[in-house]
A protein has these predicted regions:
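Helix-coil boundary and interhelical linker segments in multi-pass alpha-helical membrane proteins
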Residues: 43-49, 105-112, 172
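Hydrophobic alpha-helical transmembrane segments and adjacent short intramembrane/lumenal linkers
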Residues: 77-155, 159, 163
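Generic ordered-secondary-structure signal
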Residues: 36, 53, 65-68, 116, ...
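Selected alpha-helical membrane-embedding segments in polytopic membrane proteins
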Residues: 1-92
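Juxtamembrane boundary at the C-terminal end of a transmembrane helix
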Residues: 161-172
């Protein structure tokens, strides 16, 4: 278990990739469950943010499964699904404490002119790091150039946000 956590940290730091993980459905399920549990624990520690965060988390997890299943099938790389998706959930589990804390800080201090810019910059740095880590995972899985992988990650993020907006705000 310790070695697996170290490996996910190395993936988050962009030193390793999905090819370093075993292709295991059980590991994928455990990693996705771990990602969910980490999100729940961090959200329980921080004062509550209004909204349907748990429902959004479940939709996000299902979306990641569907996104990578379809993407890798369309691009004729379905055999890389287990390792790629495990790597994505693994590095996201590592970065989740930073990301959730940054989102919480942005929401808490959105009206405070003193803290708005530094906290927004922190959030932006985490988003950029997340995109870079995910693009590196995709680059290993697809054997594409980095800019194309960055574009795919941004497309995934936008599609996921549109789905969440549609399901939870009723705006679309």
């Amino acid at each position: 278990m310790k070695e697996l956590v170290r490996l996910f940290v190395q993936i988050a730091l962009m030193r390793k990739g999905p090819q370093d993980l075993p292709a295991s459905a059980a590991l994928l399920a455990g990693t996705a469950a771990g990602y969910c549990i980490i999100n729940c624990l961090i959200s329980a520690v921080l004062p509550p943010i209004p909204g349907h965060w748990f429902g959004q988390l479940i939709v996000e997890i299902v979306f990641v499964f569907v996104w990578y299943a379809l993407l890798l099938r369309v691009l004729n790389r379905p055999e890389r699904f287990l390792q790629t998706t495990t790597a994505v959930f693994g590095y996201q589990a590592v970065l989740a404490p930073l990301w959730i804390s940054a989102v919480w800080l942005v929401r808490q201090f959105s009206d405070d002119d003193t803290w708005r810019l530094p906290i927004s910059m922190l959030g932006l740095a985490i988003v950029v790091w997340t995109v870079a880590a995910n693009a590196r995972v995709l680059k290993a899985a697809l054997e594409w150039a980095t800019p194309a992988c960055v574009a795919l990650v941004i497309l995934q993020y936008l599609a996921g946000q549109i789905l969440l907006l549609y399901l939870f705000s009723g705006m679309l």
